[in-house]
From Swiss-Prot:
Reactions listed under catalytic activity: L-methionine(out) + ATP + H2O = L-methionine(in) + ADP + phosphate + H(+); D-methionine(out) + ATP + H2O = D-methionine(in) + ADP + phosphate + H(+)
Residues reported in the UniProt entry to bind ATP: G42, Y43, S44, G45, A46, G47, K48, S49
Residue stretches making up the ABC transporter domain: 8-250
Native source species: Streptococcus pyogenes serotype M4 (strain MGAS10750)
Protein name, UniProt field: Methionine import ATP-binding protein MetN
EC number: 7.4.2.11
Matches recorded under PANTHER family: AMINO ACID IMPORT ATP-BINDING PROTEIN, METHIONINE IMPORT ATP-BINDING PROTEIN METN
A Pfam family the protein falls into: NIL
The gene coding this protein: metN
GO molecular function: ABC-type D-methionine transporter activity; ATP binding; ATP hydrolysis activity
Superkingdom field: Bacteria
Length: 354
């Protein structure tokens, strides 16, 4: 089992502005394991960016304890490391941002090399390191191009190479795909996954998009008004969200609400027969492999008209979502519902026939 490389315990962050006291983060505890791709999701003002400054050791918490890679860095608002040790810890954490933060007057390779200016490597070693980093992010052929000559995705690749220059153990992505189109976003996420696997890099994804979490993360924390309201494996959170905000994020990411709006306009749903019901079926893991609808027809003579279906892979596990009209004798439908539950399927009745 991997150990936590980042431990935030009971973190409070309070700001004083004139006569106002702003509680930006309230009693947040998060443990991120080595090798995780960990998502922190929330709307603007949730406290995500403030929490980032705590994780990358730029912001001391008002209260609470921070441990990074086994070393306590802050405890009850006080620095626990020497200035030099704290600088070294910060070098263990790379950052990428929404707007890339590249220097316009420097080429791609010069932007990456800039991150090595305090390195103990020789000039030749630095030059070789830059070549290797640009190759790692798939941008070798653009080494001599300036940012103005690069696409958004290429700029972000340069930024990733720069963030990796000092061999960090942790990479923080602060809304790094928000300015990119969907296709480029997928390419950057695929690159981050590859770096996670190849380098054993721990990645923290700060985002307001649950789609990003769904595509890349293995664990997620949901924040609202400075409070962590829900946390756990992505599969568990998507399969069984507890909080209303989490459910809202998930329905946006899966598109189920939009599907339901269209389904409710269909004649079969508007005029649902008395011996039928509209149901949503959610299932994960091995239950996605079972021919469940065929099974309930054979066993209970209950037919299933599939109006919507979707299967996705979350953290390497298939997760399915389906909206169906089940039709048959009332007692048979009840028996079919029970059989589905026993097979690990979550059944939600959306509408019963009149």
């Amino acid at each position: 089992m991997n150990e936590a490389i980042i431990q935030l315990d009971h973190i409070d962050i309070t700001f004083h502005q004139k006569k106002r006291v702003i509680e930006a983060v309230k009693d947040v505890t998060v443990h991120i394991n080595q090798g995780d791709i960990y998502g922190i999701v929330g709307y603007s003002g949730a406290g995500k960016s403030t929490l980032v400054r705590v994780i990358n050791l730029l912001q001391a918490p008002t209260n609470g304890k921070i441990t990074v890679d086994g070393d306590v860095t802050f405890d009850q608002g006080k620095i626990q490391l020497s200035a030099e040790a704290l600088r070294q810890k910060r070098r263990d954490i790379g950052m990428i941002f929404q707007h890339f933060n590249l220097m316009a007057q420097k080429t791609a390779k010069e932007n990456v090399a800039f991150a090595l200016r305090h390195s103990s490597l020789s000039k030749t070693e630095k030059e070789q390191k830059v070549i290797e980093l640009l190759e790692l992010v798939g941008l070798s052929e653009r080494a001599d191009n300036y940012p103005a000559q690069l696409s958004g995705g290429q700029k972000q690749r340069v930024a990733i190479a720069r963030a990796l220059a000092n061999d960090p153990k942790i990479l923080i992505s602060d809304e790094a795909t928000s300015a990119l189109d969907p296709k480029t976003t997928k390419q950057i996420l695929a690159l981050l996954q590859e770096l996670n696997r190849k380098l054993g890099l721990t990645i923290v994804m700060i985002t307001h998009e649950m789609q990003i979490v769904k595509d890349i993360c293995n664990r997620v924390a949901v924040m609202q008004n400075g409070v962590l309201i829900e946390e756990g494996p992505v599969l568990d959170i998507f399969s069984n969200p507890k909080e209303a905000l989490t459910q809202e994020f998930i329905t946006t990411a899966t598109g189920i609400d939009e599907a339901l709006e269209k389904i409710n306009q269909q004649d079969i749903v508007k005029h649902l027969p008395a011996n039928a019901l509209l149901a949503q079926l959610k299932y994960a893991g091995t239950s996605t492999d079972e021919p469940l609808l065929n099974s309930i027809y054979r066993q209970f003579e209950v037919t299933a008209n599939i109006l919507y279906g979707n299967i996705e892979i979350l953290d390497h596990i298939p997760v399915g979502d389906m909206i169906v009209v089940l039709e048959g004798q009332a007692e048979n439908i009840l028996a079919a519902e029970k059989a589905l539950h026993e097979a690990g399927v979550d059944v939600s009745i959306l509408k019963r026939g009149a």
